[in-house]
């Protein structure tokens, strides 16, 4: 026997149960295995074939035992024996013509037919059931169907519903052709068919077990990953929520430290060239309560406080009020803390680049809103002298000009001539 395209086992000569077992394994996994019983199990058939060879007046019998047949899916599972008889005529091997006849030998010395088995070739345009039904009508005890030419010893499980009255098996083409040629040479061939082994259910049970275990493993892995992913997202969300709450608390603390001022009639912010709040884009009016940030920008208190609570930065220059006020902030996921101390001198000595950027974007300045709260000019001069002495001491070979800090360069033109003279004196 041998495998049909995609199914089966190729056998040569006395190939037996091992290859049939492999064929049954492929059959059990094949989606093309029809029939209720065939879908559950495949039964092999033991074949005991004998040739009675006349030789010099003495008959000699040659026996050949092998497991090379497969019971049809609708065939009775029982033993049967008889002389193999092909259909009459060279073109009738397929037994598709309902008028096909079989020449059955008789018992020696009588007209009683011997028990016989129909040897029929697969194909011809009719079904397995038609072939088996015809053999049963002609009186055969069983039907032996061999495969197409060119398929060697390949076999398939036959499905023949409605033709389950007699035993029906399939054998390979090479085996069937060999028997047919022997019969055509006048050799009487007898076959004894015995029920072989049942194959398939253990394969199905194993397949079900394997699929069940695989499904359980995949499901468990999927559920485990989903739980891990969900727990990780929940943990990150909680950490982010805690961080946001902490930052809001720090922002409230920082907002409480920022300076408030009530604008009065005559302040520069209210004059003809007065500024407007960068948040609400409205001009300042007398009695407006404004918040002065660490970067010297001012805004309406009601406008900037909600912004600072959420963003903690100046709406204009993005100056971080938490760092500017030295309030402890969390870095990344809260595992590291950073304390940024800021003194009055550090907050009042920004780099020239920062001063330039602020002067370009600021519409209001800390120096312009402090009014009567500005420190005396002498304090500015003294602070500038100290900075100049410190730089000259640290860099002896490098000439450094230190420009005294002005809170908002935008309003430098408002300085008095005395202040300009003091600055020139400091530079000299």
Curated annotation (Swiss-Prot):
What's an example Gene Ontology biological process for this entry?
regulation of protein stability
| Region Disordered, annotated ranges | 342-428
Q: Gene3D superfamilies of this UniProt entry?
A: 3.50.30.30, Zinc/RING finger domain, C3HC4 (zinc finger)
Specify the residue ranges making up the RING-type zinc fingers: 277-318
Q: What induces it?
A: Induced under anergic conditions. Up-regulated during T-cell anergy induction following signaling through the T-cell antigen receptor.
* Residue ranges, compositional bias (Polar residues): 342-351
Entry membrane topology: Single-pass membrane protein
Q: Which pathway is this protein engaged in?
A: Protein modification; protein ubiquitination
Instruction: Summarize what the UniProt record says about post-translational modification.
Output: Auto-ubiquitinated. Controls the development of T-cell clonal anergy by ubiquitination.
- Which keywords does this Swiss-Prot/TrEMBL entry list? Cytoplasm, Cytoskeleton, Glycoprotein, Membrane, Metal-binding, Signal, Transferase, Transmembrane, Transmembrane helix, Ubl conjugation, Ubl conjugation pathway, Zinc, Zinc-finger
By its UniProt entry, which SMART domains does this protein fall under?
RING (SM00184)
Q: Which InterPro entries match?
A: PA_dom_sf, PA_domain, Znf_RING, Znf_RING/FYVE/PHD, ZNRF3_Arkadia_E3_ligases
Q: Which residues cross the membrane?
A: 208-228
Q: In which tissues is it expressed?
A: Expressed in brain, kidney, heart, liver, ovary, testis and thymus. Expression increased as early as 4 hours by 5- to 7-fold in anergized cultures as compared to resting or activated cells.
Glycosylated sites: 48, 59, 101
PROSITE patterns cross-referenced by the UniProt entry: ZF_RING_2
Q: What does this protein do?
A: E3 ubiquitin-protein ligase that catalyzes 'Lys-27', 'Lys-48'- or 'Lys-63'-linked polyubiquitin chains formation and plays a role in different biological processes such as modulation of immune response, cytoskeletal dynamics or protein homeostasis. Inhibits IL2 and IL4 transcription, thereby playing an important role in the induction of the anergic phenotype, a long-term stable state of T-lymphocyte unresponsiveness to antigenic stimulation associated with the blockade of interleukin production.
**What is the protein name stated in its UniProt record?**
E3 ubiquitin-protein ligase RNF128
List the taxonomic lineage: Eukaryota, Metazoa, Chordata, Craniata, Vertebrata
């Amino acid at each position: 026997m041998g495998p049909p395209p995609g199914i089966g086992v190729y056998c040569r000569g006395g190939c037996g149960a091992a290859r049939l077992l492999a064929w049954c394994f492929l059959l059990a996994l094949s989606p093309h295995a029809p029939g209720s019983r065939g879908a559950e199990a495949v039964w092999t058939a033991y074949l005991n074939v004998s040739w009675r060879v006349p030789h010099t007046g003495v008959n000699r019998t040659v026996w050949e035992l092998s497991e090379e047949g497969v019971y049809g899916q609708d065939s009775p599972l029982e033993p049967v024996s008889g002389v193999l008889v092909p259909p009459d005529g060279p073109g009738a091997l397929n037994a598709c013509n309902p008028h096909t006849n079989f020449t059955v030998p008789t018992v020696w010395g009588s007209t009683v037919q011997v028990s016989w088995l129909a040897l029929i070739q697969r194909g011809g345009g009719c079904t397995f059931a038609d072939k088996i039904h015809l053999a049963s009508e002609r009186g055969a005890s069983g039907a032996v169907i061999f495969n197409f030419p060119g398929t060697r010893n390949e076999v398939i499980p036959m499905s023949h519903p409605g033709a389950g009255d007699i035993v029906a098996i399939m054998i390979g083409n090479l085996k069937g052709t060999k028997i047919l040629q022997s019969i055509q040479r006048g050799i009487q061939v007898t076959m004894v068919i015995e029920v072989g082994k049942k194959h398939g259910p253990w394969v199905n049970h194993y397949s079900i077990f394997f699929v069940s275990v695989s499904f359980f493993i995949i499901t468990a892995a999927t559920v485990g990953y989903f739980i891990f992913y969900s727990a990780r997202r929940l943990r990150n969300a909680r950490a982010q929520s805690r961080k946001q709450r902490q930052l809001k608390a720090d922002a409230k603390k920082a907002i409480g430290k920022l300076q408030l001022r009530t604008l009065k009639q005559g302040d520069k912010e209210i004059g003809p060239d007065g500024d407007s709040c960068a948040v609400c884009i409205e001009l300042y009016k007398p009695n407006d309560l404004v918040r002065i940030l660490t970067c010297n920008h001012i805004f309406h208190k009601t406008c900037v406080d909600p912004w600072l609570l959420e963003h903690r930065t100046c709406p204009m220059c993005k100056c971080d009020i938490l760092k500017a006020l030295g309030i402890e902030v969390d870095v990344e996921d809260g595992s590291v803390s950073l304390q940024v101390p800021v003194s009055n001198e550090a907050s009042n000595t920004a780099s020239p680049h920062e001063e330039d950027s602020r002067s370009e974007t600021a519409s209001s300045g800390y120096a312009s809103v402090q009014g009567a709260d500005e420190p005396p000019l002498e304090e500015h001069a003294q602070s500038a002298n100290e900075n100049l002495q410190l730089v000259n001491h640290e860099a002896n070979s490098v000439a450094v000009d230190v420009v005294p800090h002005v809170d908002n360069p935008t309003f430098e033109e408002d300085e008095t001539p005395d202040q300009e003279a003091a600055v020139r004196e400091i530079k000299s």
